[in-house]
Amino acid sequence: MNLKALVAASVGGLLISANEEPRLPAGWSRQATVEADRACTAGLDRSLAERGRRLLAIECTRGIDGYITVSQTIAADEYRGKRVRFAARVKADNVRGWTGLVMRIVSADQRLLGYDDMSTRPIRGTVDWRDTQVILDVAPEASTISFGMRLTDGAGKVWLDNLRFEEVAADDPSISINLRPVLPSRPQNLGLE
């Protein structure tokens, strides 16, 4: 066997391994804009883990216009008419743009019924471990609940640990972006004045 070919194959294999996308845990998926898909990685990370724990991480090595999300989607049946919380400990390193947890509730006909991506209280820069949560009401007509983490319009790295999804009491504050703006009941300014 040719020694040069063997060394090249071994080195090539190492390079491929070093550049592989981190593996997402079972049940989790990745969604990204085209630019973020090329510039960002998402998956399991043990670099900060204690006691052998795994962390979920997103890293964008260069600035992006767009987003990358790691999430999972579950059936809403068990949670209809209830208030739910997705919570995690979050750590951020040099996040330009912003990051945060995200939760989305959708009906069977794909109407958005509830949404919070922490855009009104974003995590930016370098932040040590922080307890973070999103809380939404699950409408009776809800079909699915998606929840996870997003990095938007920037670069940096963010980690999640101690993830929890649970029903909470009705008096826990829900933070939802207003999905139903007040609209006029009749057409306005059709004369373009």
Each language-model region and where it sits:
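Bacterial N-terminal signal peptides
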Residues: K4-L14
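Extracellular and organelle-lumenal recognition/adhesion modules and their flexible linkers in secreted
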Residues: L14-E193
